[in-house]
Amino acid sequence: LAALLALSRQHRDKASIDALNLTALDREIKAARETAAGEGLVAVNIMKAVAEHPLLVRQACASGADAIVMGAGLPLDLPELTADYPKMALIPILSDARGIGLLIKKWLRKGRLPDAIVIEHPRYAGGHLGAARIEDLNDSRFDFDNVLSQTRQLLHDLQIEPEQIPLICAGGINTPQQVRQLLANGASAVQLGSAFAVSEEGDAHPEFKRVLAEAKAEDIVEFMSVAGLPARGVMTPWLKNYLKRESLLQSKARCGAERCAAGLHCLTVCGLRDGLAKFGQFCIDSQLAAAMRGEISKGLFFRGASRLPFGEAIRPVRELIEYMLLGRWPAALSGGQACITASG
């Protein structure tokens, strides 16, 4: 990784950066497969909003990934991009029944069904959110019960057996009671993001983990990303300063390639580069990279809204899984099990 980063500093043109990204992705997938030793699946999460998502999808297929997970937009082109790899599992991330219906009907015309669907609740999830506006995040159409029941009806109307498309709920899930309730209501599985990001085994910077784990409810905010989607993260010094200036920056938005601070043109549509006044006005690549390095003063730290299962404690993955699936609270955490609700 260090060698690739050094090369990226020497060659700043887009073609070179894209090639280095593909090399890095290839290495990570092969390393993951080696570690997995034939157990489980190796999946790659790719944002639809990323300009070179077709290249990344094709590289993931060629490198031996088992599944592609895609959100941050409707991944209507995934069947075409993976046509040469019919065994590749395709898992879109969506938030409401309308989007699910649109995608399934489009894919059916291409002779493909999703291998699973992640239903991500924008009221609770971290990062980019599946709503058009911040004002929509609490809309009841995103509630898991509504989406699950409406999707089951959709599958029935399309004569698709429910077992053909497992539904995976994501966002704000932090207790075994929630897991059991969702499974009882028709979910096939659940997905956790922030909780695993701060696990002992997670390879994130220690400061990255600390920022996520120690964030209080009042520290977590929603704002518009440069990708044109609402996003949720921790109110770090950088984000606090940016939000103070957001209206001013948006009023001065203008289109120009030189506005791309990193020169990467990483997004298909970018509020900063393309002069879109209703979008965010910052370089998301630079801010996320700073977070990756653990730079609290400069980083953008995406995080879900709810309290983490173990609060501020950073614990092993095994303990997290045992708690969420079996209700077994870690003996090492003093004071007994905390009272946790979906709203944090």
PLM regions with names:
Residues 1-161, 338-340:
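Active-site entrance/lid segments in N-terminal catalytic domains of soluble metabolic enzymes
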